[in-house]
Structure formats: structure tokens, C-alpha cells
Amino acid sequence: MTQDELKQAVAQAALDYILPHLEDDMILGIGTGSTARLFIDLLAAHKGKFDGAVSSSEASSEQLKGHGIPVYDLNSVDSLPFYIDGADEANAQLHLIKGGGAALTREKIITAVADKFICIADASKDVDVLGKFPLPVEVIPMARAHVAREIVKLGGNPVHRQDCVTDNGCQILDVYDLAIHDAPALEAKLNNIAGVVTNGLFALRPADVLLLGTTNGVETRFAAKP
């Protein structure tokens, strides 16, 4: 199977996972990226079975609205039973690197609200050690140089993502040359640097379910109980 076919398979698997649980008044959390886009297209056929969605990016919001799915402000929503989104890397603990699409802050906020985070990814995203994919860090523009210097002290090689302004009006540093063996600790350490909005490690609050597209079919993994 091609990578696109694997993405399509996991998008379908995510739809199959949530369909039995949909209710008329339910609002879903929807992520950003190529796999999330496929999921939104599949979800559109079932838009009458739930109330609407909260989205992690303007791009996803426009796609949802284009399908006639209402999009809500998270501040008006009391609960999100499910959040469905992709990842740039995932390890065995369901710790993730996200943010290749520069939507990491909104993704992390929605993840914090959601009861269950369902991550959908193809097998190329499955890694033993996080960090081959550059770790995005969203920063307040005036703090970019300061944050970059602090990241160098941690062993990373930060590169300013040119011509990228996030939906929050911030900038992205992509951090190379990291082998991340303690993702929760690094996530907390980076977030404590003045000027960092957040970083793309999802380890303090990892995925609950990983639907991984492989050549042998979709593999379902669950986060270990604390």
C-alpha cells in the first residue's frame, strides 16, 4: 500500500471507531494535516449524527464548514468526547511529535480538553526514539532569538521556519538533532523557557489510542495506564 492508501485506511478506522458513539448533541475535536483532512472528508457523510466540531486550525475549520459541519469556538463547549488528529512521530508510549503544520498550540489545547485523543498515522511515523522529525516550538516573535539560544543549551539545533506565521500570530522554531529519551521532561523544560508558547511534544498528555496504518492493516495501540 502507498502512504496515501495507509492514511486513507487509518482515517476510515478512526471513523469506524467513533461512529457507534456519536450522539446528536456531541461535538468532536478535529485536528490538522493530511490525514486529518481525509478523516474530515469521510466524516462529512455522517454530519447528521453529531452536532459539530471544534477545529485546531483555520484550514480545518474551512474544510469542515465546506462540508456543512458547524464549527464551534472551544470557549463555548463544555466537553469533547473525542479528538482525532495525526502526528509527525509516535513512539511505543504514544508520546508524539506534532506541529509540522504549525497548529501545535491549538492542537495541544484541544487535546487537554478531550476525553479521548485518537491519533491517526501511517507506519512511517512509528519510531523507537522521538526526534528525527524536527521538533516544532511556537514562540512569541520578540523572544525567538532568546528561545533559540536556550534550545542550543539543551543540545538542539533550532532553525527559524521562514514565512510561517501561526494562526496565533507567532513564529516556529524547528529543532533538529534531538534524540528524545524522556519526552515528558523535555516538554516541560521547553515550555518553561520565557517566550515559548508551547512545543510539539505531546507526552505529558499523550494520545489515548493510536491507529497505525501498516501494510498488514490498521494496528490499534493503547496508552499504558499510569
Curated annotation (Swiss-Prot):
InterPro entries: NagB/RpiA_transferase-like, Ribose5P_isomerase_typA_subgr, Ribose5P_isomerase_type_A. The active site is at E107. The keyword Isomerase applies. Pfam families: Rib_5-P_isom_A. The keyword Transmembrane does not apply. GO terms for molecular function: ribose-5-phosphate isomerase activity. GO terms for biological process: D-ribose metabolic process; pentose-phosphate shunt, non-oxidative branch. GO terms for cellular component: cytosol. Pathway: Carbohydrate degradation; pentose phosphate pathway; D-ribose 5-phosphate from D-ribulose 5-phosphate (non-oxidative stage): step 1/1. It catalyses: aldehydo-D-ribose 5-phosphate = D-ribulose 5-phosphate. Its EC number is 5.3.1.6. Substrate binds at T32, G33, S34, T35, D85, G86, A87, D88, K98, G99, G100, G101, K125. Gene3D superfamilies: 3.30.70.260, 3.40.50.1360. Keywords: Isomerase. Catalyzes the reversible conversion of ribose-5-phosphate to ribulose 5-phosphate. Belongs to the ribose 5-phosphate isomerase family. Homodimer. This is Ribose-5-phosphate isomerase A.
